[in-house]
Amino acid sequence: MLVLCRSVSGKSLPENARIMGETDETDFSPLQIGQQYKVYGVMFYTSRIDFLVSPASGGPMWVSSNLFDVVDDEIPQGWGCVLTERSEGYADLSEAFGIHSICGYLELIRSYSHYVGILERDPEELKIFYSQ
């Protein structure tokens, strides 16, 4: 699955799709307009969908799908999904942020410590991430 970045500005997010304090001034750097990104995961909120992408200069980050156009819509072979409210660890994401489910490579959806590790830039977890 590939997406094309068409904006790095919070202005591109509809009001009802803004979460965690996002505003018009929110800057989604290190994304680059016109750059294609491989999608490593898809996260479903009530009001929006996020893609897990990895800009060359920033590492893995979840970003609203509102900032992208889908270039290749094929879901990668071997992906799975986790329903957050029913899964240990992931239930925290449901309660705290309203995340309903995550789809992605198996380590992402089967290991909450891996999910947290890539966001916290744990070297061992990043090694797994970049092997995808």
Model regions: which residues?
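SH3-family beta-barrel domains
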Residues: 1-22, 83-132
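Short, charged beta-turn/beta-strand-edge "cap" motif at the junction between a beta-strand
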Residues: 9, 43-45
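Compositionally biased, intrinsically disordered low-complexity segments enriched in polar/Pro/Gly
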Residues: 21-22, 46, 59
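Conserved beta-strand/loop element in small beta-rich adapter and peptidoglycan-binding domains
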Residues: 30-41
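Short aromatic-glycine-enriched beta-strand elements
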Residues: 46-52
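A short macromolecule-binding patch
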Residues: 58-69
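Mid-chain, well-packed structural core segment of small domains
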Residues: 71-81
